[in-house]
């Protein structure tokens, strides 16, 4: 059975990931950056993307890639494990991205993540994206 403190942390991690999707899709880059540990590692190589190290580098690259696109990120079915000031989770995900030149992406897969608690706040320390499905429509 999950204890009350663990459940509060579970909810905090789930809310962190919900904010990740919302801030990314609304292009609130300052709020988006605040979700990550300073030394975050974001690895999208399994999905054909880059490996990014450090908050500033990661947010800058994500912003450059998606700032002009309309995006919808959805996560669900979390498997969250809390261990003191660290947590791990696997999230089922789906994303849709549409660029103004007509290029579109529709994808699904999983985020595999590690979180750390810093000064009482949960932050994303590692994120690895794997894809099960990708459909790309080339630009016009």
PLM feature spans:
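Short, cysteine-centered beta-strand-loop-beta hairpins and adjacent loop/turn segments enriched
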Residues: 68, 96-104, 134
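Short, surface-exposed coil-to-beta transition loops
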Residues: 73-75, 106-111
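Transmembrane beta-barrel outer-membrane domains
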Residues: 11, 69-71, 104-106
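Short, low-complexity N-terminal intrinsically disordered segments enriched in polar/charged residues
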Residues: 1-38
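Short, solvent-exposed loop/turn segments at secondary-structure junctions
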Residues: 94-96, 129-130
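A solvent-exposed, acidic/Ser-Thr-rich amphipathic alpha-helical stretch
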Residues: 30-95
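Short beta-strand edge/turn micro-motifs at domain boundaries
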Residues: 88, 108-138
């Amino acid at each position: 059975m999950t204890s009350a403190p663990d459940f509060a942390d579970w909810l905090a991690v789930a809310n962190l990931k919900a904010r990740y999707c919302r801030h990314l899709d609304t292009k609130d880059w300052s709020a988006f950056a605040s979700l990550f540990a300073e030394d975050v590692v974001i690895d999208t190589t399994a999905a054909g993307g880059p490996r990014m190290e450090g908050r500033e580098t990661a947010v800058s690259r994500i912003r450059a890639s998606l700032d002009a696109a309309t995006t919808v990120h959805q996560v669900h079915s979390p498997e969250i494990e809390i261990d003191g000031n660290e947590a791990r989770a696997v999230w089922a995900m789906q994303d849709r991205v549409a660029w103004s030149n007509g290029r579109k992406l529709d994808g699904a897969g999983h985020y595999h993540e590690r979180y750390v608690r810093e000064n009482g706040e949960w932050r994303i320390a590692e994120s690895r994206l794997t894809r099960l499905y990708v459909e790309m429509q080339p630009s016009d």
